[in-house]
Amino acid sequence: MRLRCAVLDDFQDVATTLADWTPVQDRTEVVSFTDHFASEDELASALADFDIVVTLRERVPFPASLLDRLPRLKLLIASGMRNSVIDYAAAERNGVTVCGTKSTSTPPVELTWALLLGLARSLVTESNALRSGGPWQSTVGADLHGRRLGLLGLGKIGSKVAQVGLAFGMEVTAWSHHLTKERADEVGVQLASTKDELLATSDFVSLHLVLSDRTRGILGAPELALLRPTAYLVNTSRAGLVDQDALLAALHEGRIAGAGVDVFDVEPLPADHPMRTAPRLLATPHLGYVSGNNYRTYYGHAVEDIEAYLAGAPVRRLGGSRCATRPGRPPASYTPKTRNPTHLENPR
């Protein structure tokens, strides 16, 4: 009997076309779900008969309460190599191996700049006015050249955002708890002496931090109050870094020029959520990692993870997960191909 594999939150219905699943089709039945499961009960019911689950990033939490209800689950694959919403101890206790995939940092860098440029030049406002027969040239754009870009975080993504800012002729400064002058010099940016200094002196602020107990809520009402009324804030990192209610208040009261947000406390965002109608907000539905190349990598590596698991030698394991698997050697190197295997299903 073949194992059953569920692919969650395949909103664009592309999991079956952006990777070649034929290496595992004889041993695995793959089912893609294009709708989001809103509750744990719904998710537990839908996944009860699956041995393998593929989930994208941190869209779906896997706490102990859910893992305990999935006795058939043996392999959980999460795209990327870091996931904070999986209870790894519970996975190990339930005999579930957790594996990841590689990814590229380029797409979130590109989206960061799409949001920043969209804000600076009021692209949505101007485009909507043009399409609806509204006023011709109703706004005056904010310049980038010579302005200060403040980055909270200078890791793999933040440093690439910095390079683009420098290419625009911006003055780039950065800060994080562990950022050193040597690292700032290496990237070619200035090191802000404090977080408050960066916020108070920047024309554009962009967040590129890992969400942790230390960084959660790093921008609350007191920090947002430091921003200039002409400043723009961009968050393509994690929703938990910013106090959402404080940001909404700042936008409604006009205390900052605008914000570009790609991540939210609840995803997908409910239809009546206040972030959908907030003024001065350019919002996107968590598109930071959503690109063709990234998805080819995610799903291609998911196939490779399944092959390796079936061979008894799981690869890219996350959280120290362990389970009993048959002995064997890892599969040969796999290169994703674009095709649409006929055996795949999409029930929703």
Language model segments and positions:
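Hydrophobic beta-strand scaffold residues
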Residues: 30, 97-98, 172, 191, ...
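Rossmann-like adenosine-cofactor binding region
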Residues: 45-48, 58-66, 178-274
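Redox-cofactor binding/interface segments in oxidoreductases and associated redox assembly factors
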Residues: 52-55, 78, 206-207, 235, ...
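Rossmann-like dinucleotide-binding domain for NAD(H)/NADP(H)
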Residues: 98, 216, 230-348
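Phosphate-binding beta-alpha-beta segment of Rossmann-like dinucleotide-binding domains, i.e.
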Residues: 94-96, 100-148, 152, 163, ...
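An N-terminal-biased, well-structured beta-alpha scaffold segment characteristic
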Residues: 1-99, 104, 200, 220
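Glycine-rich Rossmann-fold phosphate-binding loop(s) that bind the pyrophosphate
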Residues: 10, 154-155
